Regions:
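Sec-dependent bacterial lipoprotein signal peptides
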Residues: 1-13
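Ser/Thr-rich, low-complexity intrinsically disordered terminal regions
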Residues: 14-148
């Protein structure tokens, strides 16, 4: 029971705010490799095994909202961009993994000022996060790792 309480206390330090967190009974090296493979469809910007940090570069895509304002006008493009951050941490007998997507939309605010024409944060895509988490789970299951 004390081990479980200790694990839960440590998990708060090991996760990213708002992330999808999981714990695996598996070696750090195996989980690290699986985490890296799980985001291989995106360009990697940071890959620091010692710190347990993987960050992808921004990828741009068509936005989900098409118009704005009372007249439902097109703004300065309908673009979104996203990047993934994966944190892998050693915790006693388990390894934790936190997956978080940062997503932004171009020019959602009205006006023509410099302040209105920039990337604005929006909610992450649960589907994109789930895709990475499911890939990770599948890869670790193939290697015999147990989720705890």
């Amino acid at each position: 029971m004390n081990a479980l309480i200790g694990l839960l206390a440590l998990s708060g330090c090991a996760s990213l705010s708002g992330s999808k967190d999981q714990f695996f009974v598996c070696s750090y090296d195996v989980v690290w490799s699986a985490a890296l493979e799980s985001v291989k469809d995106r360009p990697i910007q940071v890959q620091d095994k010692d710190k347990g940090l993987i960050e992808t570069d921004w990828i741009e895509m068509e936005g989900t909202e098409r118009s704005y304002g009372a007249f439902e006008r097109e703004a300065f493009g309908n673009r979104e961009r996203a990047r993934m951050t994966v944190a892998v941490k050693r915790l006693n007998d388990v390894t934790s993994v936190s997956v978080l997507e940062n997503r932004q939309r171009w020019h959602l605010k009205g006006g023509i000022s410099q302040e209105s024409t920039k990337w604005w944060p929006i909610d992450p895509s649960e589907e994109a996060e789930a895709t990475v988490v499911n890939r990770l789970n599948r890869k670790l299951k193939e290697k015999g790792c147990l989720a705890s």
